[in-house]
């Protein structure tokens, strides 16, 4: 006969074993060059992931701009997801090949803010991020601009320069795929803090899901279009989450940025989101910061 206290002990051991089995998701942040303050923003990205208790985070930093890049050869395959906070010199050919293979074979990738300005000459990278801006991109060379109208994606083939934003102001973000795991359970419309609202991004725009948009206000030098802010892209077996938000640490304090980033990294890594929507999420009219 088994004593009751032994049974309780056994059950508790099982619970402990189950929790221990949920191994943390391994994340690699890449940085080292950017026209943004990457030395300030990478520690914020790292902390935001670590504070969920679901991730362990390493950082791979490239040599500085203009230096020999041949030493930059991270072992992407050791991670479930790579987050780019990089916008700079081309990577060595071997690293480019390794990264393409990594995502094509099912590795996760997250393009954060100006990472979608990077590598205009790298075709596979443009396919991963779907759309990008600046870097002398023109719509006629890179692919259509992506706008949202009439409840669906509209590919805008008019020629033009890709990548623009007005002054940093608060703006509303509207979910367009509310059942997507990254945003499921979050408010349909929420007020983001002062940030750059990217407009006129262009690219191959293949295998693209627009998760959320924002209206680019002509009164703030905008396009008058609903522009993609959060996107999900398939590249081979890999999942890509593309967030245009988070210009600086102040913009990254928005709970809307924080939560969509944390959930987007988990989704890119695993295809699932286990994080619950928080209680302090912004509403349609009020920002919320942490
Ligand atoms: Zn910016």
Regions found by a protein language model. Name each.
Residues 50, 56-58, 78, 146-236:
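Catalytic beta-strand/loop cores that center a nucleophilic Ser/Cys/Thr
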Residues 106-110, 211, 241:
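Structural detector of well-ordered beta-strand residues that form the stable sheet scaffold
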Residues 26-119:
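Helical hinge/lid and interdomain linker segments adjacent to catalytic or ligand-binding clefts
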Residues 34-35, 89, 116-118, 188, ...:
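Short, solvent-exposed loop/turn segments at secondary-structure junctions
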Residues 23-25, 40-41, 51, 74, ...:
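Extracellular ligand-binding/catalytic regions of CAZymes and related secreted enzymes
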Residues 18-22:
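Sec/Tat signal peptide C-region and signal peptidase I cleavage site
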Residues 89-181:
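A glycine-rich, often tryptophan-bearing local segment used as a flexible ligand/cofactor-contacting loop or short
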Residues 5-17:
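Bacterial N-terminal signal peptides
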């Amino acid at each position: 006969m088994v004593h009751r206290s032994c049974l309780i002990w056994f059950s508790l051991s099982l619970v402990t074993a189950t929790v221990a089995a949920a191994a943390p998701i391994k994340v690699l942040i890449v940085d080292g060059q950017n026209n943004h303050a990457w030395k300030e923003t990478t520690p914020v990205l790292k902390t935001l992931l670590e504070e969920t208790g679901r991730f362990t985070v390493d950082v791979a930093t490239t040599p500085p701009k203009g230096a020999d890049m041949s030493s930059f050869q991270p072992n992407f395959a050791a991670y479930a997801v790579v987050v780019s906070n990089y916008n700079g010199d081309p990577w060595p050919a071997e690293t480019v090949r390794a990264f393409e293979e990594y995502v094509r074979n099912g590795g996760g990738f997250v393009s954060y803010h100006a990472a979608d300005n990077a590598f205009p000459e790298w075709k596979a990278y443009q396919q991963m991020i779907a759309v990008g801006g600046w870097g002398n991109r023109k719509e006629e060379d890179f692919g259509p601009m992506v706008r949202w109208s009439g409840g669906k994606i509209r590919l805008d083939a008019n020629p033009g320069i890709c990548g623009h934003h007005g002054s940093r102001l608060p703006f509303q973000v509207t979910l367009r795929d509310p059942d997507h795991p990254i945003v499921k359970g979050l408010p349909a419309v929420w007020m983001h803090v002062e940030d750059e609202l990217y407009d006129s991004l262009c690219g191959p725009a293949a295998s693209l899901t627009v998760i959320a948009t924002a209206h680019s206000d002509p009164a703030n030098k905008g396009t008058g279009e609903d522009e993609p802010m959060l996107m999900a892209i398939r590249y081979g077996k890999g999942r890509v989450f593309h967030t245009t938000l988070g210009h600086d640490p102040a913009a990254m304090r928005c709970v809307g940025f924080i939560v969509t980033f944390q959930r987007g990294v988990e989704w890119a890594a695993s295809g699932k989101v286990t994080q619950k929507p928080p209680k302090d999420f912004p509403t349609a009219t009020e920002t919320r910061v942490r």
